[in-house]
């Protein structure tokens, strides 16, 4: 399929996707009933969309195009209410978190969808292993060239986004010692990590054409990059965050990305170059492994800085942009989180350290999601 022309979007408009866990009480393992749940709610959703993801234990909530985080929060809240009622009617529960702490990938059923079945054919068991749960944020751009500039700018802050959203310390019944283990699942995919270097939209079109020769890439949706342009929507899509345990944190993360995008495209503070990515995977690893306690290194100067310090600097830089787009509350909440030194991964570990079981942890996550 040829790459579509870049759709002109209103700059800094917002779209958010949340991949949620569908679980079966009282054992709280992943359910395989998302299709039943989607059928139950599809005629009750008036704004946004509830839809499938890769496997039958995943449920995606997606907003429409939103002006700001307040509009997005309203749409999510309405969808949450409908989904929770339908889940209760079918004796299911819903929760966030980047991984389910004890599910077995061998049990996961890929959705009966042409695209997902084709992906299963291409990638085999890797697709079942990809039963992990992330938050994706789209930001509108006025042109393809703006999208490429924004993508490179946001890529500088991938470690910050990962550290702030880290919520996947457990996988397959094991403490992984990572704050965010979810991104590791995609390391075996040939398109894992950052997008290959291009400097403008014309070069991106040539890159996509080359990738399509592999026969594994039919559309932009087949690419698993950390950040990718979405020409059909006219957006840049950030894909590195774990799904948070609460809607409020999800909205705050979206506000952070929207405000960062506003600052980047308004101020144009960087002259991007390929060398910017020299230490990308090392810095990304630090965020996944240690969260805000990780240390990132500047590829140009060799300077090292904790992610706590680097994130506080970012929040300070983007505060004026956040004020202009109505996202100040998100930046203030994230500032409090950084100062506290806590993320959701650490809260999960604290629960288990206090004697809680992994079954009890999922139950608690369902209570958090339902109680907000």
Curated annotation (Swiss-Prot):
Statement: the UniProt record of this protein carries the keyword rRNA-binding: no
GO biological process, one term: modified amino acid biosynthetic process
Documented EC number(s): 6.3.2.2
UniProt GO MF annotations: ATP binding; glutamate-cysteine ligase activity
Signal peptide coordinates: none
Transmembrane segments: none
Name of the top EC class for this enzyme: ligase
Top-level division of the source organism's lineage: Bacteria
Reaction catalysis annotation: L-cysteine + L-glutamate + ATP = gamma-L-glutamyl-L-cysteine + ADP + phosphate + H(+)
Keywords: ATP-binding, Ligase, Nucleotide-binding
Function, as annotated: ATP-dependent carboxylate-amine ligase which exhibits weak glutamate--cysteine ligase activity.
Family, similarity comment: Belongs to the glutamate--cysteine ligase type 2 family. YbdK subfamily.
Subunit structure: Homodimer.
Protein name stated in the entry: Putative glutamate--cysteine ligase 2
Organism expressing this protein natively: Escherichia coli O1:K1 / APEC
Gene name linked to the record: ybdK
């Amino acid at each position: 399929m040829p790459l579509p022309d870049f759709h002109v979007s209103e700059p800094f408009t917002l779209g958010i996707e949340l991949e949620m866990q569908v679980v079966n009480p009282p054992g709280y393992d992943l359910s395989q009933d998302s299709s039943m749940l989607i059928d139950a709610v599809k005629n009750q959703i008036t704004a946004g969309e509830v839809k499938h993801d890769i496997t039958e234990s995943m449920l995606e909530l997606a907003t429409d195009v939103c002006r700001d985080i307040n509009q997005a929060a309203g749409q999510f809240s309405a969808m949450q209410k409908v989904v929770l009622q339908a889940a209760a009617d079918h004796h299911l529960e819903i929760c966030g978190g980047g991984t389910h702490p004890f599910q077995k990938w061998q049990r996961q059923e890929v959705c009966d969808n042409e695209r997902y079945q084709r992906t299963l054919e291409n990638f085999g068991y890797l697709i079942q292993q990809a039963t992990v749960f992330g938050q994706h944020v789209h930001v509108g751009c006025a042109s393809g060239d703006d999208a490429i500039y924004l993508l490179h700018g946001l890529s500088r802050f991938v470690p910050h986004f990962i550290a702030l959203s880290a919520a996947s310390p457990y996988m397959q019944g094991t403490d992984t010692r990572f704050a965010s283990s979810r991104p590791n699942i995609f390391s075996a995919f040939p398109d894992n990590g950052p997008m290959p270097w291009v400097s403008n939209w014309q070069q991106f079109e040539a890159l996509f054409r080359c990738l399509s020769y592999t026969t594994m890439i039919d559309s932009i949706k087949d690419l698993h990059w950390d950040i990718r342009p979405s020409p059909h929507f006219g957006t840049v899509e950030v894909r590195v965050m774990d799904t948070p345990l609460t809607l409020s944190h999800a909205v705050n993360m979206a506000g952070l990305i929207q405000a960062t995008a506003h600052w980047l495209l308004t101020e144009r503070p960087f002259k991007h170059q390929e060398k910017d990515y020299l230490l990308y995977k090392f810095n990304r690893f630090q965020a996944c492994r240690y969260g805000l306690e990780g240390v990132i290194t500047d590829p140009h100067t060799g300077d090292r800085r904790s992610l706590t310090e680097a994130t506080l600097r970012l929040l300070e830089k983007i505060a004026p942009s956040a004020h202009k787009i109505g996202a100040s509350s998100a930046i203030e909440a994230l500032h409090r989180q950084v100062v506290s030194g806590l993320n959701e991964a650490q809260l999960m570990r604290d629960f288990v350290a206090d004697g809680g079981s992994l079954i009890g942890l999922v139950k608690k996550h369902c209570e958090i999601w339902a109680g907000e």
